[in-house]
Amino acid sequence: MITLMSENTEISTNCNHNKVGFLGLLITLGIVFGDIGTSPLYVMKAILHTGETIDESTILGALSCIIWTLTLQTTIKYVCVALRADNNGEGGILALYALLRRLKSKWVYILAIIGASTLLADGIITPAITVTTAIEGLESISPNLPVIPITLAIITIIFFVQRFGTESIGKSFGVFMLLWFLLLGMVGIISITYYPLILKAFNPYYAVILLAKSPQWFLILGAVFLCTTGAEALYSDLGHCGRKNITISWAFVKTMLILNYLGQGAWVLTHAQTASSVNPFFSIMPQSMLFFAIIMATGAAIVASQALISGTFSILSEAMNLHFWPRMRIKHPTYVKGQIYIPTINLAMYIGVVLIILLFRDSSHMEAAYGLAITITMLMTTLLLGIYLHTKGVSRFIMILFIGAYCTIEGVFLAANLSKFLAGGWCTMLIGCILFLTMYVWVCAIKIRRHYISAKPLDDYYQIISDIKADGSIPKYASNLVYINHANKEGAVDDKLLYSIINKQPKRADHYWLINMEFVDTPDTLEYDCETLIPNTLYNVTMHIGFRIEPRVSLYLRQVVEDLVASKKVDLTSAYPSLRKNGIPGDFRFIIIHRVYYPENSVNRQQNLLMNLYSLISKIGIDDPKALGLDTSMVVVERVPLIINHRINNIRRITKIAEEQPNRQL
């Protein structure tokens, strides 16, 4: 097994983000905690808008719910448990699925695509609600300020700069978020001094009493849940920052968040008459700091939006390699490892965020749409984590206890958030359903296509391939002929590949290369095996590609060839005398076998529907040569029919052959 260098691994990194230290902790603040760090902008405001009476028991109960939600959900489930379920250092629901894929259970991939779909769907709301809430703070200074146009302008800039990368400004995100969290804690402490009894909220008794007695407890829980919506990002960003950096940073972040929530609660109890008509986050700010706080809130919202957009690109890149999503054009706008840009997704997200802003108009209405989808993501993560714990030898009792406890907690939150369905939750659920349908159809169609690929033993054709190479009467097609072999069995070859070489048009070449691409369960694996099947004629190359690595077959094959030439295992100098005497290497040509589905051939209506939807969905992706990273000037695409349980229509003869009618006059 020999290691390859990908385009990604060649990109330099200036520091090791996973190394524990001040720099690593600072970078972690900028990458991981943007979403959860901006939740104080809208959580308390959402609680006050539930219609519950504003008194000490309500506020203490709501704050107690926030504190213990952050503890049970974020600290225990994600920081203490999920961060340990890493896939070679990578985290997130798709990385977790890759660990469990070998179980070959249908439900494992169903849970994964449900979780990924709802995570992506809720991501449309985050930039909209965070930026809108931050800009709404300006209304306390100038009530007639046009919030929506300013918000749309900021959102437009955020998405526009994605094509250029964020390397230059990204370095300052950590410093900015450090200042942001210090601001949260400082103003929280100042406000707490005016009502110290607010510290009683640490007692879970007040949460229990509120949930037991309040008629609005469902609505309050739906608002409380917004404080932990960013918890999934902690797990997804594990590979960027490392478990220790996230764990240590979270201790600081959680402290600052709780201080700010307590400060807002203290302000509400001392201004109960007017609290419901303003945003407590901005109200606890000293008047002299208000404009500065609005600027900081806007900056934090931009950081949160940037982190979410980058996270969306990463999730969909993983989904492409796991065959959950059609392959799209991916760009690398900077020299930072792992920073990618997907133009189609960037445009789709921008349109989605703009529509959300125009549809809901203000953050109070957006709160109703926020949280429902991410609750489902958390439930899916809980179930997958439970399965993972079982595969690691954790006792069945502990596994059932973990799944039972968190399914109960998240089930209650889900029920609470369902109360917001008609008020706006339908929006993210609709987006999530569209994404789920896309992923489900893609997975099923890929399985159908693979099932109907016919494979033949390759060694049965060694002789005829050698004969074609030696047959001078056949025009030479290329010096080096490269095929992508889709047969999954060892020692087998796609029969359409053989048909292309032998039957369709005999293709004579000096060297034949069969490329097998195996997408493995580890994130950054990039290795190959090469087997010489016919000396100096036929080679079988298997590339093992991690689910975070972008396929670049031309680049990787060049490295394989260079290795073989350097070790004198193959001579690729052109066979043409005029080129050979000058040491010119032979040319390469790639043949892509593209199977075209013809629906009239299928007798299975379900398969017919899936394949028709697959054909429709594939239009948003790129073609096979681009998806494989091939130089399109050297590629020939041969289209063949994909036969699926085709109908057999017997043709009936209506005329007799001449021998049967000797006396017929023509």
Predicted regions, residues:
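The structured alpha-helical core of multi-pass membrane proteins
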Residues: I2-L666
